[in-house]
Amino acid sequence: MYIIPQDNVVIKYITFETKGADPLKLMERAKDILLGENRKYTIDYRQGDSIWFVIDTDTWEKEGKIVPLRGFCSSQNEEIPKQYDEVKMYSAWNVAQSNPCFEIWLYYHFYENKPEDADVEKYASFKEFVASTISGGFDFQRDPARLEDAIENTRNNISQDADGKPTLYSSEVYVLGEEIDKFVKSDLAKLRNKLG
């Protein structure tokens, strides 16, 4: 993910020690570092703090590990007004799921339509497909200028199954993108002008 620093925004990117982080382990880690007695970070709901779990569908969906994470986020959101009378319920805890993986979000920075299955099937993985489709690969210095395109393209291509889960080639990361865009809009305009 890319972030453009802002004076009025503090972003804490919390990594996980292992590759392919299990959503249930992410949830437990969040409980520990954000909610536990020995928490490392403090959430200020009065300031509109939010927490985002950006996850791939991978095998986690089949293993039933995403639904509990979503349930945990919902229950945390429901608790906010109970803990703080002056704070109305809002989506402080969020899941941004991509199907099949985060790279679909990168793909939509450049393309308006979902990829064709026949094109994707030529590659060993969707990540390889995206790497070959974006000439030179995704440039994290230059390509954030395409954030608004990515938001629009992803929003226009999102579809969900009967349970509200993103279907193939869909991503909820655009919702996080909309939140980021509120703070970086003018900087992205400057970057677009600089790049021509």
Where are each of the predicted segments found?
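C-terminal accessory helical subdomains adjacent to catalytic cores in phosphodiester-
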Residues: 2-17, 24, 30-52, 57-196
